[in-house]
Amino acid sequence: MLCMMAVVSIKAAEQPNVKLTVGNNAVQVQIDGRPFTTYHFVGEAASPFVRPYFYPILAADGTPLTSDQMITNPKEHPHHRSMWVGMGSVNGLDHWSFQQKPAPPPQRHVRFESVGADSLVEDLVWEDLAAKPLLTEKRTIGFLAYPDGSRSIDLTIALTAAGQDVTLGDTKEAGLCAIRVSSQISRKPTLMNSRGGKGEKQVWGKPADWVDESGTIDGKPFGVAIFDAPTNLRYPTPWHAREYGLLAPNEFGLHVFDPKLPGGAGDMKIANGRTITFRYRAVFHPGDAAAANIDQKYGAFVKGLDK
């Protein structure tokens, strides 16, 4: 049975002109009359589909800021489909990666509960290999823009155990708000976090409010950041963040990130019928983290959580 828990969208002070066009397979998103992203919620026959994803994600000037590896380099992390929600161990089943055989368990779109001026509320089911529900999800997606040309996607993810207890397992392969940045950005990247960590050794597996990766695309500076909400369990989250371009908050991989902890230390159990909720914001910005005032944007994000 689908969880009907009310979820409040994360709002910001900015009120861009957002237009959502819902089709049979995807939602087209425009900001101020220019394309921002496409949210693919149902697969098409020509492309393998396991879970919904956002692609492309464009800067205000039209520059693509993310990579869909299924299209650009399917031999390397084909499950990195620009921006997606994934979890590598759901009662032991892999809802993160992609393999041809056996077919991976899907996240299945059920319906859009509502479509607003700048947001969507979507019902989904995370299934097992027999197409039985493990989790129901209510996913709230919000879109906004900043005066400096940055654009953002908000995710509120409410997961409910459906018919049995569900354990989200201690694994490296997880990110309820995961992004693969453009390969141009990751050629000479600056990867950093809110605590002053720079480079993969100081960012991967380390707790932080936010992580940002920036670089250049065709000679122009751009970056991508993800914000973790203080309301999330295990805040501030450790991060599965790599200089090759992956950004993902990972509240679950505690033993993976710190082998001194016992195996399974990061397991998170959801009792049958219970719900846990996570909130994130992804910011797609011109310039590096400092130029984009990511710290200030994070502060505004936190203040907006109660609105």
Task: Set out the residue ranges of the language-model regions.
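Bacterial N-terminal signal peptides
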Residues: M1-V7
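Sec/Tat signal peptide C-region and signal peptidase I cleavage site
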Residues: V8-A12
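Beta-strand-rich N-terminal accessory domains
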Residues: A13-H77, T156, P230, A289, ...
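Acidic, contiguous internal or C-terminal segments within carbohydrate-active enzymes
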Residues: P16, L20-G23, E122-T171
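Acidic (Asp/Glu-rich), glycine- and aromatic
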Residues: Y39-V42, F49-P56, Y146-N193
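Extended, loop-rich substrate-binding clefts of extracytoplasmic carbohydrate-active enzymes
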Residues: H79-G149
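Active-site/ligand-binding surface loops and adjacent short beta/alpha elements
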Residues: D165-T167, T171-P238
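Beta-strand-rich recognition/accessory modules
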Residues: F227-K307
